[in-house]
């Protein structure tokens, strides 16, 4: 059984007293299917580098890596019927610059829309269970960080 490795990010921005998360609507998915930016780890790249690259390609944003949040592991079935074991490493990334939705033309086919969502709503709005869990971890991390101040 083949293995597949990807990396993604929970990109956060603090604005007007609230935390916001960068989410995408992947190309060809129904409206309301919100996900986190992610992609396959290329040979020679680290998962962290992949996560930062995917953020820029799929949202138009540039961020700074804060920490690894965890891995999401699952099986899926390819169109040819083959099973694949997939591991997606997710990282917490702080927004540095860029305008959400300014997606480079060569990656526009991958994403129908990119938008800031309130972080506290992300566990409810994200379509995939593992990504909801990563958003919840990011929310917990930020709550602990604010308590420490």
Name what the model sees in each region.
Residues 36-69:
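The catalytic Nudix box helix
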Residues 143-149:
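Short, charged, intrinsically disordered terminal tails
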Residues 16-18, 29-31, 42-43, 71-74, ...:
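Short, charged/polar surface micro-motifs in flexible loops or helix N-caps
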Residues 90, 101-135:
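NUDIX/MutT-family hydrolases
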Residues 1-36:
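N-terminal strand-loop-strand
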Residues 35, 85, 116:
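Short aromatic/basic micro-patch
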Residues 60-99:
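Active-site segment of metal-dependent pyrophosphate-handling enzymes
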